[in-house]
């Protein structure tokens, strides 16, 4: 049985590992669903720069059990980016947010509206699949959504991605 892993908030210095897992995850999950040329064009170096910028917006030096939430650009929005780590190696990540929903404009934050969670991404290093990492990250996200007062959570799955549909069901 593989060694245990921990879940902790992401930091800017994790950007390269997050980018590596995102690229590997896309190439694994979307093979045959997305044009191969696009998958081949995914670039860890470019994604690292983007990830570093995003992760730099999150609060730093939080205790490991902190939900690492930060106010988003919209009133009442919260965001979190968590990693599964074993021996300092990043095995997967989960990025999620919540915002007060605007009933007239779904997806737009409205102060005082019902808090609705959104799972933006959950990727696991393909070599680490089947070890409970995805379930642990999802469980953490669901607990955080509850703490944020969310009664609903939205996510999108690419049509044909039966592995993801099975996981989320």
PLM features per residue range, with description:
Residues 5, 9-12, 19-127, 135-140, ...:
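Acetyl-CoA-dependent GNAT
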Residues 12-15, 161-162:
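Alpha-helix N-cap/helix-start and coil->helix boundary motif
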Residues 125-127, 131, 159-160:
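Active-site acidic-Proline motif in GNAT/NAT acetyltransferases
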Residues 151:
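Short acidic/polar active-site loop segments enriched in Thr and Asp
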Residues 168-169:
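Conserved active-site tyrosine of GNAT-family acetyltransferases
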Residues 155-165:
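Conserved beta-strand-loop-alpha-helix junction that forms the acyl-donor binding cleft
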Residues 1-2:
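Basic/polar N-terminal segments that are highly enriched at the extreme N-terminus
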């Amino acid at each position: 049985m593989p060694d245990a892993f921990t879940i902790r908030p992401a930091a800017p210095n994790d950007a390269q590992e997050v980018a590596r897992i995102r690229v590997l995850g896309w190439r694994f999950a979307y093979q045959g669903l997305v044009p191969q040329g696009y998958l081949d064009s995914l670039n860890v170096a470019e994604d690292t720069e983007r990830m570093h910028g995003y992760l730099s917006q999150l609060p730093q030096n939080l205790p490991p059990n902190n939900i690492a939430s930060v106010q988003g650009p919209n009133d009442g929005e919260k965001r979190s980016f968590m990693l599964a780590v074993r021996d300092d190696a990043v095995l997967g990540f989960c990025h999620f947010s919540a915002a007060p929903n605007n009933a007239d404009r779904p997806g737009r934050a409205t102060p005082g509206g019902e808090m609705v969670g959104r799972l933006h991404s959950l990727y696991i290093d393909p070599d680490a699949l089947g070890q409970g990492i995805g379930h642990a990250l999802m469980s953490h996200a669901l607990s955080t959504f509850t703490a944020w007062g969310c009664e609903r959570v939205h996510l999108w799955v690419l049509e044909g991605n039966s592995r993801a549909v099975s996981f989320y069901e």
